[in-house]
Amino acid sequence: GQIMYNAVKDFKKPVVALVHNAGSAAFLAIAGVKEIVASGELSRLGSIGALVSLDRKFIQTYKDRFDEIYSDLSSDKNAGIRSYIETGDSSLIKQSLNETVLAFQSIVTAHRDVKKKEETLRGGMFQAKDAKSRGLVDIIGTEDLAIKRLKTYFK
């Protein structure tokens, strides 16, 4: 999402995004476009958040099979995952996720006129009409409409 967002941001011409489903990284990728067109009323957008999935069985197998030895000069390396593996404490991982979400929200609100911010930025997905009322979509329509909207920027 971040790489595509940067590419759109640096692109010298307006970009109109036509999407059916755009959640999480896909929404980040289109956050800076000139207009977002939802392809129909069943389109869903949002999921402005972050998560990490950790396989407990894999972690237990990893703990049983491997020893990790860190340099005395690298005591903070992988601190979040190390804390989780060693003690089950996910607080450092959550802290990192929270920082990521705040940055994600900042990007979205810098480019979109987000309504109902507290609700909209909690990670939910919204169908097209609801997403439009929240400022996540500009218009609901077809590919032809998206092309027409794009052409208006080149007159």
Predicted segments, located by residue:
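Glycine-centered flexibility sites
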Residues: 25-26, 46-49, 123, 135, ...
